[in-house]
A protein has these predicted regions:
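Short, hydrophobic/aromatic alpha-helical segments in well-folded domains
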Residues: 61, 84-87, 127, 141-145, ...
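Active-site glycine-rich loop that binds ribose-phosphate moieties when present
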Residues: 120-126
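Short, hinge-like loop/turn segments at secondary-structure boundaries
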Residues: 91-93, 118, 157-159
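Catalytic cores of alpha/beta
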Residues: 150-165
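Charged, low-complexity surface patches
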Residues: 54, 120, 152
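Conserved Radical SAM active-site core
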Residues: 1-100, 104-112, 125
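A structural motif corresponding to the C-terminal end of an alpha-helix
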Residues: 64-70, 126-138, 166
């Protein structure tokens, strides 16, 4: 993850750096592309961190992706993605929108410990169900699997049950 030394971050992991011109950079890149493709976000950092509630940069970027006719793949641990369901539906009607959600444990209390500051699993599950109901394709990532913490048969079975229902 982004804590790796190869990224040469000179601050605490919990500190957030905002690329203030991200929306403008994305628009310039989309304008210059002749061939449409899927635009992905969330591989290295969650696009729906709590600060996104006020910044709305992810929403603005999705609006650009929609306007220019590209597809979108969003990977998050946040139910805040539902705020942008209108744009995701529009993208999906024109191209393709996929929301990928990580589920680590079926236990919300354990989730709060090993994944602080993100939506608990039950909120993510409800988000997956809402996305499904709105016709947005979803993918579930089951990771990390931590030995002796969340690698029990019961936990994995409960997460798989959520996946089937969502």
């Amino acid at each position: 993850d982004a804590r790796s030394a190869c990224y040469q971050m000179n601050h605490d992991f919990e500190d957030i750096e905002v690329k203030e011109n991200a929306v403008e950079l994305l628009e310039a890149a989309l304008k210059s592309r002749r061939k449409k493709c899927m635009i992905g976000t969330g591989a290295m950092t969650d696009p729906y961190m709590p600060i996104e509630k006020t910044l709305c940069n992810t929403r603005k970027c999705l609006e650009l992706i929609d306007r220019y006719g590209f597809g979108a793949a969003v990977h998050t641990k946040s139910a805040l993605v539902l705020r942008d369901i209108d744009i995701l539906k529009s993208i999906n009607n024109k191209s393709k929108a996929v929301v990928q959600m990580t589920l680590t444990t079926a236990d919300d209390n354990l989730c709060k410990i090993i994944e602080p500051n993100v939506s608990v699993t039950s909120e993510r599950y409800e988000a997956l169900c809402s996305l499904r109901d709105e016709g947005i394709p979803t993918v579930v990532w089951l990771d990390p699997v931590l030995p002796f913490i969340n690698d029990t048969k019961d936990n994995i079975a409960r997460i798989l049950d959520m996946c089937i229902k969502a």
